[in-house]
Amino acid sequence: MLIIKKSSELTCVIKNLKKKNKSKIALIPTMGNLHRGHLELIKIGKLKSNILIISIFINPAQFSNSKDFRNYPKTLNEDIKKLIEYKVDILFCPTLKSMYPFGYKNHTLVNVVQYSSILDGKTMSNHFIGVATIISKLFNLINPDIAIFGQKDFQQLIMIRQLVLHMNYNIKILSAPIIRCFDGLALSSRNRHLSLEERKKAPKIYNILLELSKKIKLNKLYNLKKDYDAILKNYLIKLNNYGFKVEVLSIRNAKNLMPIDENSKQAVILCSAKIGSIRLVDNIKIKL
């Protein structure tokens, strides 16, 4: 596996790869602390390409506060061992200076306006602007044929599809399903920070999403806003009683995250909630 830390070196490597007409490049952007969910992305990448590039960069621009950034798990050595085992072709793990030579606070920003301030964007100041900015930089540096993201961060996935469309990137966006623990908790790098008691409660989010999806299907309330708002309120109370501080619990069109209506064919139920200081996100899609 080739390990690259400088953007200039990456540019040269990509240029040489592009000269080979049969090279099909897949990119999987990550912030490291790799787990089974990332392995699923890698499996798709290896299946759909012949050059697989993983990026590991903990992007300060997408954190709401400096404490979260400092506390994010940094496991580069362990990640490198895993990527070698998974037979990844290239690891791009740039320094902060390499990605933001003038400082990220002074950097030109990319704002996908339709998605940066709704749902999770309401409570996570500038998060999606930071994500869109770093993904744009990676796309510009690598110019992959495909890029692969997980469905757990569903709003991010939809936003990136919009980014590709609006900025005329010739990149196919693929997604991988959520990978869960034995009890239903969605795998996340932040799970390691949960206390034993918080870890026991954490799967309640997925349980609530399952109950909610069954309730909606059973009652056929796909396009009656007043009805599903009432249902959401009941489950919001349940989550609060379990000890969660709910930031988002919403039913949206799975294609564009707009409110569902009579023309919606698939919905997504989104939940973002804190337990203690740890923020968990999850979702479940349902056919309408």
Swiss-Prot record:
Residues bound to ATP: 31-38, 150-153, 179, 187-190
Molecular function terms in GO for this entry?
A: ATP binding; pantoate-beta-alanine ligase activity
Annotated beta-alanine binding lies at Q62
Catalytic activity annotation: (R)-pantoate + beta-alanine + ATP = (R)-pantothenate + AMP + diphosphate + H(+)
Q: Which SUPFAM superfamilies match?
A: Nucleotidylyl transferase
* Compartment(s) of residence: Cytoplasm
Q: What is its EC number?
A: 6.3.2.1
Coiled-coil intervals in this record? Answer: none
- Sequence similarity: Belongs to the pantothenate synthetase family.
The cross-references to NCBIfam families, in alphabetical order and at most eight, read: panC (TIGR00018)
Q: What else is known?
A: The reaction proceeds by a bi uni uni bi ping pong mechanism.
What is this protein's record name?
Pantothenate synthetase
**Organism name:** Wigglesworthia glossinidia brevipalpis
